[in-house]
């Protein structure tokens, strides 16, 4: 924090403070024993979520939002902030609407994966996880922000679960041969680690 403060203080004292965009983001989160897990290696919120701060001239500072975003959204955001043409092959979405109004309508989701065939879809209120073995998890963050109660079998969420499933890839291929992590897998049905 101190070193970042030094950089920002130097920027404020420079002639470039009014034409510089600052983007700060982190690596993924980390489990500290929750659900019998250490390190990241899951698709739950604590292991998936990253901090993201964007400060740009002409935009009010201090706005916060819980709308889902992904790191793919940074490049289109920078293009729009710099008034440069958008590349239509980009997968991300500009976050400028959220910089203007943190509560703006935001129909986009955040997609993530961990290991072959394991995917998470995060919308504003829900997280859906699909595992290679066919098991699923679904959490309502409005009343279960720590994702303790899997709602995948709850008929109340049938439509939301179906809507989230539509974001899953149609195929899954290894990026690296075999299991590149060397760590135990998580069995959602038993809520235990397996070899």
Task: Indicate residue ranges for each PLM-predicted region.
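Aromatic- and histidine-enriched alpha-helix N-cap/loop-to-helix transition segments
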Residues: 2, 69-70
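C-terminal cap/loop subdomain of S1 sulfatases and analogous C-terminal strand-loop tails that border
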Residues: 28-34, 60, 72-146, 159-160, ...
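Active-site-proximal N-terminal segment of extracellular/periplasmic enzymes that hydrolyze or transfer
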Residues: 149-157
């Amino acid at each position: 924090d101190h070193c970042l403060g030094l950089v920002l203080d130097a920027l404020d004292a420079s002639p470039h403070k009014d034409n510089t965009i600052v983007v700060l983001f982190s690596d993924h989160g980390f489990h500290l024993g929750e659900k019998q897990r250490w390190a990241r290696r899951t698709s739950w919120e604590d292991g998936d979520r990253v901090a993201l701060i964007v400060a740009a001239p002409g935009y009010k500072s201090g706005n916060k939002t819980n709308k889902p975003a992904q790191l793919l959204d940074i490049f289109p955001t920078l293009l729009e902030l710099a008034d440069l043409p958008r590349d239509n092959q980009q997968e991300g979405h500009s976050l400028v609407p959220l910089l203007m109004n943190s509560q703006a309508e935001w129909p986009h989701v955040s997609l993530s994966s961990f290991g072959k065939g394991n995917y998470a879809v995060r919308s504003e209120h829900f997280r859906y996880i699909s595992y290679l073995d066919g098991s699923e998890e679904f959490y309502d963050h409005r009343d279960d922000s720590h994702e303790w109660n899997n709602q995948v079998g709850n008929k109340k969420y049938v439509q939301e679960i179906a809507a989230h499933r539509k974001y899953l890839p149609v195929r899954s291929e290894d990026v690296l041969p075999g299991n590149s992590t060397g760590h135990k897998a998580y069995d959602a049905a038993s809520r235990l680690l397996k070899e």
